[in-house]
Each structure stands twice: as C-alpha cells, then as structure tokens.
C-alpha cells in the first residue's frame, strides 16, 4: 500500500502541547521586562482616553495570601482589558506602610524600650523588606504595572502630601479636638478606627444592680403616690461591671411605661414590660403598685451603690426592651450614647469621670479598685455590690463583642482627648461632610449594586472620625496648641506647609526632632507641640490626593481622579470609606467613579480559610505546580461578587479547562502552517459558506466578550471562550474542516478559505484570553503568522472579523439548523458504535428522512452534506419514505438510518467510497483524492 502522507497538509506547529507554565512563565516575565512593555504602553497611550484603576494598598507585612492574589489578578484583568479596548490604563501599585502591626513586629524583635527615632528607623527598614517580597510575588502573578516606581505611604513625598491633605481639611474647618469615647485597645495603647474593629464571641458577667433613691418624694410623686413606705431602688442591667465605678447617670426612654414594684423589703423601678422576667431572674415575688412614663422620672436623683455621689435620670431614645430592665446605667467615659446623653444634659468634659488608664488599669486613686486591670476587677465589683445590698442578680452570657483585629483582644469605648474629622461640623463653605459623602454615594456606580446601600448606611450612622493615634510609626499631626487656650496656632495651615517641606526631604522624623522654636520663634514657649500620629486609614484614604495628583499624576484633571476602586467587601468600612470622606472634605466629591467589591475566599465547602482547618491554598504553591495562568483562570471563572471557593480540586478543574483552551489554540496554530496572511488571506466573498459562518460567530462572540469585560463579568468571558472552544469549534467547525484542510490542494481556495477563518479566529481568540491568560496569550502571539507588534498587549481588540449578511442563503439561522441536525446524527452514530454496528464515523452511511422544508434546506449543501456530517455518504429522502427501522431524532421532522458502508476505505482520506480501487495507478484511493493529488483539485462551495 502506497504511503500518501506526503500528499496531505498535515498540521504542524512548534507551539508546545504541554504548557509547562511554572517553567515557561518566568521567561515571559523577562521578555516583558526586556522590551519595557509597561513603558511602551504609556508611550502609545498619550492620545488614548484614560482609564485609572487606583490600587488599594496592601499592608507591607507578611507574605501574600490567596485573597491578595484574587485582588491583584482582578485588577490586572481590568487594566489589560481596558488597554486592549483602546484606553491608556496605567496601573501604579502601592503599599500601606505605617501603623501598629509593623511597630509591633519591630518591638517583638528588638524590644519595647527602643528610642522612638530608632523604632521609626527599624519600622521603615522592615516595611521596605516586606514590600520587596510581596512585589516579587505580585509580579510573578503576571500583574502589569509600574513596579519600578510604586507608591508607598512611607515615601517622604507621600508623607509630606498627606500632611498637605490634612492641611486642606484644617483649612476648611473639618478638624477639631474633642473628648469622646473611641474604640480603645489596651494592647495597641491607642484608639482604633471603625475598620479596625471586628466582632467575636466573649463570655461576660451580667448583673442587675439597684441604685437607691435619693429623691424619694419626687419618685413617689412621679408614680402618683403621696409617699413611699419602704426603700426604693431603680434597677439597671449591664454586661460590664467594671463600668459601675464610673457611673454618672441612669437612662430611661421617655415613652416606655415604668412600674413601681413592691418586692417585699423594697420597691423596684423596672420597665413594666420586663417586670415578670426580672422578678424571675431575682427569684422574688412582686406586685406592680403604680406605673409612669419614663419622662416622669427625668432628673430624679438616685445614689451610686458604693460611692457618695448622685446618679440622675436622663431621657434617652436608645433605651430598648430587648433585654435587661429597661433602664441603662450611664458611664459617659465608656459609652458613646451615654457620652452624648450626658453632654446633652450639660455635663462638661471636666465633669466626666474616666478612671481607666490607657493600659486598662484603674487609676490608683480609685477607691476599692485602684490599680486593678478592669477585666480582673469585674468579680471584685460584683462582690462590692453584693456587700452593699445592691446586687439583685449575677449570671454569665456568651455574646458578640468588639475585638481588636490585630490582637484579637476585647476593646472598650474610652473617652480620651483626640483629633476628629467632624461629620456634621459646618465647614467654612458648603455642606457638612456627612451630607457631601451621602450625596457622593448617589453619584457613584457600585458593582455589585448592593454596595451602595451598605456604604450609605455606614456613612449615615457613623460618628465623627477619630484620626489621631498615640503611636511612633505614623505620619504626624503637626499641630501646635496654645497652652492656655487649647486653640490651634493661628498660622496652623501655613506652618503645616513648612513642616511638609521638611518631611519631603527628611521623612516624618523631621517633625519629631523639630524644635518648636525653629518655626514659632519666641512664641514657642506658649505652645505645646503635638506628637500624635494619623490613623493609617487617613494614610491610605488620601492616596487619591497625594499619589494620583502628586507623585504619579495619572488621575483625571477634574472630578473623581480614579475611574475605579476595587477591593474586598470589608473595604466599605475601610479604604472605600476613608477615601470617600477625604475626597468629599478636600474636593467635595468622591475620588472614584465606580466601586467594585469582591468576596472572600473559602474552601469548596464554604468554610473560611484557616491553617487549623488545613484548607488554605498558598498562591506561591499553585504557581510553582500549576502556573500563574491557572490561578488567573480560576479567578476569572468565579463570580467574585460572593464568596470565592478555592481548593486543589477546583484548581484542577481550572487546569482541565485551560488544557481545552490551549489545545484549541494549538489546533488553530498547527493548521495555519504555511499560511501567510499577506498573500493567502481571502476576502469574505471568496470564502466558503461554513468558514464565513465561523468568522461571523467569532464576531458575535467578540461583541459579547467586549461587553462582559466592560461590565467586569469575567466569569462570562471565561464561559463564552471555553464554550466556543468546546462546542462551536471543537464540537462542530474544527471537526468538519479537517478533511478539507488536510486533503485538498495546499493552495486551493478550499484550504485557504479555511485557513483565513482560522487566522481570523486565532487573532481574535488570543486577544480575548490576553487579560486572563496573560502568559499563554503572549506565547500564542509569537506563533501567529504575519507581522505584528512585539506583544499582544500592544494590540487592541481584533477588527478583522466580518459579519455574515442576513440575506445570504446559508445565513446564521441556517447553520443553527445544520448544527442541530449534525448533533442528532452524532447521537445516532454513537449508538451504532456502542452496538458495534459501525466503527468510526467514516465507516457509516447515513440516510436522513426529512420533512419537505428541512429536506430543501439540507439539500442546499448538495454533495457536501456528508463532509458536514463527517460520514462517507449522506443521503436525503422524504420523511414519508422512512422505513420502520429508521430512528426518530430530536429534530422535528427528521428520522435517521445509519448503516455500515460496504465500500472500500480510501487510504488517503479514509472515506468509504464506491470508486476506491477503480484506478489502476492508485488502487487505494478514491476519485476525489486522485483529483486532489494529480488533477486541478476538487472544488468546494459550502463546507
């Protein structure tokens, strides 16, 4: 038998079947670096519309985790897709460098007794080391950006511009000093921002405490009685016994009904609705003697249980009936609501009792409990209450309680003198900050949409922003306070600029080593130099101002400087939040046009990632075993708006999907062997009908893919590309064209038409996958025929796809119908193969018994129907002629009959044809193959 292999156009490409991503990806990174890809993109972007994604800075501490990888990959997909869409899309990565975690690391390594300047020096060194490690990991993910010049909040210029941003807010009169309860961590020794608070279960004692009445006559009158014939107590319930020593008032709701209960040896004042549950808790019998509204009890005095002072009754709307007694004990130093209620009743800052020090220990002068740590003092307070006869009940509950996000230890509210940005303070011009921020939220697009209501609720209900911290490693609040009046220096804004100029040269150390006389001269003795530092959320929250307009100047000239902020859903109370407040305070609008939120990673069972559960996925390990492109494909394939599931099994499924896409791409490249688009590309009107359909299908898909990228629906991009590779290409088009591609003349219209379609599809496909499979797309790009830019990222979406006119005979609807018929035939062929009736498809002859309209449609393909169905023979017959053994199909009006061909198999095309063996010179070939190798070649019109 003659070997006709040399007469076939067999596929050939150097593009490897095995990806070898862990080994090959670093070569691509080197290539991008060698050609200066990021710099070239900036050079060609000058005339393009700008799209700015501003990077939310990760904290410069520790290795990156899977959440970091998700975040950076999503950002890179957006930046790359915007670049391909014709935008100038710079990406400046950044790092958050100041704050307690780094200071804590330095103290752990070098001890807590370091001089402050040495602490700052070591913190700066530590942050720089951490940044280098994280940067290498982010680059390895394939993230394209200005890695040689990232922004760092500890850069001198950034520290200086942060001071300038604060000065802008001082200038507009948003900043003030006040005594207020703030979230306080004993381990941090500092106030915490709202975003630094997390909630966890905690066991706490609960106590019911009776405060003896001091104004017995007034209490009797409030309940409509002439007098009281026995002692009376108003009863509070609390989970914080340690706050009792600081009690200064008792709060009732003005509209709640309160009862005077005869409990035997005393009267008890309780909310009427809670009398029964309270008496059960006290194990007492009791009878309601009289009732009164809460407002009737206002300003009646009761006595503190063990100190010689009074606790008046104040009215407060926040008192509720969901637990306790309906009366709230008020320690204004340790509760925000208590604080504001007491202030409303005229209590001055000097009157507020604050016996708990910054380390959680009572001041030594506090009677009974001085020098005790508050959590350890709880049982001692309970014992004292029992001793004086004021303890009515004592239990333990497990409840959700605020904790420090770093130390995982319980927090308290603690009234301290701090610097605040006022939410409702009237600025020099315009609306309050709260009003500005709420209005800005309505002008911002949220992805997903529910983020708008979430952020709106947080802004509407939040207190003033405490921006001061009592730490060493942070940007200073460079204020001078008059020692006598407590007022800021009248030249504060001007002085802040002088400080900023010094910080620009020397960093934050310039302020801490500054002698006040250098700036204030002879007035220095009258002023106190403030050494508080700024909340780290102020650091990151002002990056839009001092990075996009300052150090890198990539933002828009007016309006929001960034088109998009993209972070995890926790940043509604973090970076999104602080950036909104600073943007509205300084510029009177949000710093962003869109906010995109992604969820957190969980395992395939929906559990949080935890080392103790052993379900963590380390991105570096995935990269080393599967490759960064697999990680990127997994991120793209997931609906990130909710929880993002990841496990080894899930990643393996992504690897399987990747192989399908790679194999499809390899098929395209291998069949473009010998194709030069400069000379071989056919215009649409000269192409075969099936090829024109394939290009049209790619065009329709590209429109959908571009829209999905625009709307950040990357999982739709993935599913559309994957389905195109599996179904339209792998399950239909590519199988059909193999015969024509391999067996027709190398330069025939039939083959060049097919190659033209494959070329167009490959050109489009490589761009579709480039934002997601960044490394693989670059690899594919190098193997595509024709002249092209150095990198796929220097191109834009492919514009060579042509639309199939609606008025052609074999239009989109026609091919949809053919695909359905082919699927029905494939199903019957599978059944026949399973029954051993036929071997391969080409051993089969199929007769299609079709109703008239369908028969007319299929007949348009003529003799080429068999090539579409990939059978040796395909015969059309009327449905009425179907024999009893014809099989019904899923296509209406179509029955099928498959039989094994009795003809010999062609040794070249493998079709079973009756003319095989009828040609003496080529006894192994069919007439079609002989025509293709010796004659002018077969002519195809459709497929």
From Swiss-Prot:
GO biological process: isoleucyl-tRNA aminoacylation
A Pfam family recorded for this sequence: Anticodon_1
Designated name of the protein: Isoleucine--tRNA ligase
Uppermost EC category: ligase
PROSITE patterns: AA_TRNA_LIGASE_I
Top-level taxon of the source organism: Bacteria
One GO cellular component term: cytosol
Keywords tagged on the record: Aminoacyl-tRNA synthetase, ATP-binding, Cytoplasm, Ligase, Metal-binding, Nucleotide-binding, Protein biosynthesis, Zinc
NCBIfam families, per the entry: ileS
InterPro entries per record: aa-tRNA-synth_I_CS, aa-tRNA-synth_Ia, Anticodon_Ile_BEm, Ile-tRNA-ligase, Ile-tRNA-ligase_type1, Ile-tRNA_ligase, M/V/L/I-tRNA-synth_anticd-bd, Rossmann-like_a/b/a_fold
Residue ranges of the motif 'HIGH' region: 58-68
